[in-house]
Amino acid sequence: MSRELFAPLVRACRTVDHTYVFHRKGSVWGFVKLIREIRQTQFDWVLDLQGLFRSGVLCLCSRAKNKAGRSDAREGARWFYPLKANLPQKGSEAHALEILMEFKRLFDKQPDGLKPLTFDTTLSESNRKPLCDPPLKRLMIFPESRRTEKEWPFFQELTGMLLQQSPNLQLVWVGTSPIQPTFHAAPHVQSNRFVNLSGSTGIEELPALIGSADLVLANDSGPMHLAAAMEKEVVALFGPTNPNQYGPWGQFHNVLTAPDGDLAKLTTEQVGKTLMQKL
């Protein structure tokens, strides 16, 4: 089950056989149709990993031998399924992925041993072409996040600085909205050292883009978690959110945390130094 926004990415994941699409802002009739679609299949297990009212209703209405959800479910969802995955020993302070891995115990498995996610995705010709020229090292930059206070404000300054200081580095911007460079980008675009793909990629292209990079730089965001899930090295910039709960899984050593939770206090020089050490 996936929101329409993420469905193309979920479909591309090699571990997924079928995707049901949930329209978050859809009508009540659309929700009823989704329930009918789900009920056409008899499942062995249905797991509610989100733990909210609507996901709980979908779990309740499904035809499954076993139905399970989160013990910390909200909005009354915990009453919709007979089986529950307990919180890990750290409780609600555990990492979000640690909480979800507790579902493995329902299948007599230990909550560890995750394998990297793999995808069947390709890039469009227009996006693939500027990424074909070796032998430059490639830094993939995702400047956006879901909330403004989680966005580091110095990506423009950092990009300009790295282009000046690192002639053997290609920098690629990726984002949902078009971002115009404020630095003098023309010569770097002509030499293919700066590639601006912001506003021109589909979500299903993200795995191919991330896979082509030597290093990823991102805020606390979906692309950061995707890079970590693919086991691609990612430098993650954290402000108000707690990296112990939401940091890149398996790469907590690559987290740069802003003083006082204020990303404006994380300097360009600090981030640039960390990147160059890893490149």
Where are these regions (language model features)?
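Catalytic machinery of carbohydrate-active enzymes
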Residues: 1-279
